Amino acid sequence: MPRPTKFRRVEFFPENNYFVPWGKPKCEIHEVVLKVEELEAMRLKDIEELNQEQCAEKMEISRQTFQNIIDSARKKVAIALTKGKAIKISGGHYTTKLCKLKCIDCGEIYEINYEQDRHLCPNCGSEKVICNKKADFCRRWCKGQNRKEQYEESKNK
């Protein structure tokens, strides 16, 4: 039985996720799907100019996995450019450091980097905030924070 695929850490999401060749009729356009983690691998290596080890570390994967991801990404982009195909950025197996929180007092829903302090609502300043998403990437962190808060509350009683 193969090992489960590990989530790849992604820090960047493009504003535009679809690119098409100029002047080609819609009925003739075929597309290549570039996964979100493939775009992230190219961004880290080619734009941020990090070495392979640094890229793999940032994405929380092995160097070999990083190499496989970037090879796949570059091949897809090369095919799209040489054969006049559209590039659609979508899907993949990734996670992010963003977590959606909700303020219990004012109802404000906002996103933060879950590794930073999350205890104050940016709208009203309340400390009564809860995780609004319960996604896999933040479940452990939110659960750990809730346990810590419950422990501190029981200590103060």
Curated annotation (Swiss-Prot):
Q: Which InterPro entries does this entry report, sorted A to Z?
A: RNA_pol_sigma_r3/r4-like, UPF0251
- Output the Pfam families linked to this UniProt entry: DUF134
The superkingdom listed in its UniProt entry is Bacteria
Q: Which family does it belong to?
A: Belongs to the UPF0251 family.
Protein name as it appears in the record: UPF0251 protein CLJ_B1488
**Which source organism?**
Clostridium botulinum (strain 657 / Type Ba4)
